[in-house]
Amino acid sequence: MELVMKDAQSLTVSETTFGRDFNEALVHQVVVAYAAGARQGTRAQKTRAEVTGSGKKPWRQKGTGRARSGSIKSPIWRSGGITFAAKPQDHSQKVNKKMYRGALKSILSELVRQDRLIIVEKFAVEAPKTKLLVQKLKDMALEDVMIVTHEVDENLFLAARNLYKVDVRDVTAIDPVSLIAFGKVVMTAEAVKQVEEMLA
């Protein structure tokens, strides 16, 4: 299939990577798994067995007029243990390579259909200056954008790192969540070839 580039040239790309049907269920599963994998899972609370304190009965069972009590570590008491205490856990979900690649292909194909994927011959700035990149993006009418190159140019990376809703990555760093999150994705022709090789 042919994709029209920004400068009116066309680029021949694989239909299996950029022209497949959108598999919403697969994309949802991969995105949820990706987000789950980012969770720290380090929260921890103490049960009544783990709270520091004496095991002594606070007062005798009968005769005081107070409610009976057997431990200062009871969950009913202030500073007592937690009834169903949270423990550290691994939230990661398994996603095999075939599913992950399939989700990326689905997302890239949907970006093409929605005219959110812009292909350029090359994308660079002459110096590591934010204003140069801002002007370049303004000329292209782009704001919320992820720029994908076959290798990250240092000038481009430094110019973009202080910009809101602008991200620069190489092909190996793209992921399903980021591709969906940005309004537009600018990709160099070299990066497109690299993506095809990576997802082949």
Swiss-Prot record:
Xref: SUPFAM superfamilies: Ribosomal protein L4
GO BP: any one term: DNA-templated transcription termination
Keyword field: Repressor, Ribonucleoprotein, Ribosomal protein, RNA-binding, rRNA-binding, Transcription, Transcription regulation, Transcription termination, Translation regulation
InterPro entries in the record: Ribosomal_uL4, Ribosomal_uL4-like, Ribosomal_uL4_dom_sf
Function, in words: One of the primary rRNA binding proteins, this protein initially binds near the 5'-end of the 23S rRNA. It is important during the early stages of 50S assembly. It makes multiple contacts with different domains of the 23S rRNA in the assembled 50S subunit and ribosome.
Organism (species): Morganella morganii
Any Gene Ontology CC annotation: ribosome
Family of this protein: Belongs to the universal ribosomal protein uL4 family.
Complex formation: Part of the 50S ribosomal subunit.
Protein name as catalogued: Large ribosomal subunit protein uL4
NCBIfam families hit by this protein: rplD_bact
Region called Disordered, residue ranges: 44-70
GO molecular function: rRNA binding; structural constituent of ribosome
Superkingdom assignment: Bacteria
